[in-house]
Amino acid sequence: MARQLRRDDYTVGWVCALPVELAAAQEMLDEEHPDLELDPADNDENLYALASVGGHNVAIVCLPAGRIGNNPAAAVATQIRATFKKIRFGLMVGIGGGVPSAEADARLGDVVASQPHGTFAGVVQYDMGKTTPSGFERTGSLNSPPQILLAAVARVKANELRGRSKLSEHVAKLRASPSFSAARLGLTCCSKQRTVSVRVLPGFTFCPPQQHN
C-alpha cells in the first residue's frame, strides 16, 4: 500500500502545461501517493499527483485544460507554494522551444537542460526580446536556476563522462509504456536501438537520442 504523507513532506513542485506531459511524468515515478485532503478554506483549485522519484517527494500539477501561458502557470505555482509550504523549488517540465544553429544542433527528441553562461541566466522567456535586422535581441532575463539544481546538472555531466548515466534507462522505461511506444507515437521509422547521451554546448546541456547499429 502506498504511503500517506503530509503536506510538509513534499519539497518539489512540478508543473506540466499539457495532459500528455503529466501522463509522461507519472510514467517515470518511483511511487505514487494517495491524495491528501485539502482544506476548502485554502481555495486551492489545483489537482495534484503526489509521488516520489529519485528520493524526492513531488507534487505534480497540470495547467487547466485550454489554459496555457504565463498567467495560468503563475497562478498554479502560487497555489502550490501556498498549499505545500516546504516546497524548495519548482520545475516546469515539458515541451520547450529552441532554434537550431551551427553551435546548437538541436533536433526533435533532444532533451535540453539549460544552465547559466556569462550574462545569460539560463532560460529565455519568449516575450523578453525582439527581432532586429541583426537577429534576436534580448530585452530581459529570468533568474538563474537554484544552486542545488545547477549542482545536479554538474552531477549528470560527471556521470555521463564516467559512463554511469542512467538517462537511457529512464527513456527506455518510458518507451516500454504502451501509451508512449514509438509505434503509438507514429515513430515507426525509429527501429534501431536508441540511447541517450549528454552533449555540452555553451549555456546548454543537450541529451540527444543517438542511433546505434
Q: How should these model regions be labeled?
A:
Residues M1-N213:
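Intrinsic-disorder/coil detector with helix-boundary
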